[in-house]
């Protein structure tokens, strides 16, 4: 497996938190925090994919690389596929890692962990999950659960993703973390597929891959990064990063 290419899709048109990638956290735009964490993962080159000049400018001002993509992509995966062809048209990278641009507190170590399942040639897509500890999250439809069985140390094979509380019975529930490592061929196949029945019902893009028979494995990690979707999330991220700076 060649060095992975890390791509960070970032767009300004968020409904709940406008201009989210440029939101100030400790004097630095949020997208810069995410880019720095991805660089610190140390697994391969990092590129921000955006449809907005302002986002590209703040990354390039700090010595990073950004590429401009079309503004009309229906999903982050489609933006990822376009950016991959711009950055690596010769196919030198056979793995691409999609790090969401709204994870400013993400631990670089879990970005590095995300590619581990791809050492198994049967795995098409790799992702992450963490044990749910807070009871209120178990029934929260905004907390996506992964249902799977153990295939190795701290590793699950995904059988389903759902917003419902699942699976039933004793044992841990797992919070899916929306970070993906794709084989290049798997990404090309994925974005060419039509939306699946379960994908449309659950509003979960990854179900398209499972419905098509693609294999997704997940590493179980301890750190659950904060996804910034609302003004309240942004304030929490500011607090968390301020504490880290003090320590």
Curated annotation (Swiss-Prot):
Swiss-Prot/TrEMBL GO biological process terms: CMP-keto-3-deoxy-D-manno-octulosonic acid biosynthetic process; lipopolysaccharide biosynthetic process
Catalytic activity: 3-deoxy-alpha-D-manno-oct-2-ulosonate + CTP = CMP-3-deoxy-beta-D-manno-octulosonate + diphosphate
A family per Pfam: CTP_transf_3
Pathway: Nucleotide-sugar biosynthesis; CMP-3-deoxy-D-manno-octulosonate biosynthesis; CMP-3-deoxy-D-manno-octulosonate from 3-deoxy-D-manno-octulosonate and CTP: step 1/1; Bacterial outer membrane biogenesis; lipopolysaccharide biosynthesis
Gene3D superfamilies noted in UniProt: Spore Coat Polysaccharide Biosynthesis Protein SpsA, Chain A
InterPro entries reported in the protein's UniProt record: Cytidylyl_trans (IPR003329), KdsB (IPR004528), Nucleotide-diphossugar_trans (IPR029044)
One GO term describing the cellular component: cytosol
Stretches assigned to coiled coil: none
PANTHER family attached to this UniProt entry: 3-DEOXY-MANNO-OCTULOSONATE CYTIDYLYLTRANSFERASE, 3-DEOXY-MANNO-OCTULOSONATE CYTIDYLYLTRANSFERASE, MITOCHONDRIAL
Role according to the record: Activates KDO (a required 8-carbon sugar) for incorporation into bacterial lipopolysaccharide in Gram-negative bacteria.
Family annotation (HAMAP family): KdsB
Protein name as annotated: 3-deoxy-manno-octulosonate cytidylyltransferase
Chain's gene name: kdsB
């Amino acid at each position: 497996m060649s060095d992975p290419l890390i791509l960070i899709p970032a767009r300004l048109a968020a409904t709940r938190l406008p201009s989210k990638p440029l939101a100030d956290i400790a004097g630095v735009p949020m997208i810069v925090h995410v880019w720095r964490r991805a660089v610190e993962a140390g697994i391969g080159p990092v590129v921000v994919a955006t449809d907005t000049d302002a986002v590209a400018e703040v990354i390039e001002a700090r010595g990073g690389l950004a590429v401009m993509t079309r503004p009309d992509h229906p999903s982050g995966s489609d933006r990822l596929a376009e950016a991959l062809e711009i950055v690596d048209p010769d196919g030198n990278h056979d793995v691409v890692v999609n790090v969401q641009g709204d994870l400013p507190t993400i631990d670089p170590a879990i970005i590095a962990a995300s590619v581990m399942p791809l050492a198994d040639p049967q795995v098409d897509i790799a992702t992450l999950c963490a044990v749910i500890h807070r009871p209120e999250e178990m029934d929260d439809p905004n907390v996506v659960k992964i249902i799977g069985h153990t295939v190795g140390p701290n590793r699950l094979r995904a059988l389903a993703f759902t917003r419902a509380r699942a699976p039933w019975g004793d044992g841990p529930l797992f919070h899916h973390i929306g970070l993906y490592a794709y084989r290049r061929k798997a990404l090309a196949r994925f974005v060419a597929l039509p939306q699946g029945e379960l994908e449309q019902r659950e509003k979960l893009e990854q179900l398209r891959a499972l419905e098509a028979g693609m294999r997704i494995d997940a590493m179980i990690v301890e750190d659950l990064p904060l996804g910034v979707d609302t003004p309240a999330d942004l304030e929490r991220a500011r607090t968390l990063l301020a504490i880290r700076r003090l320590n």
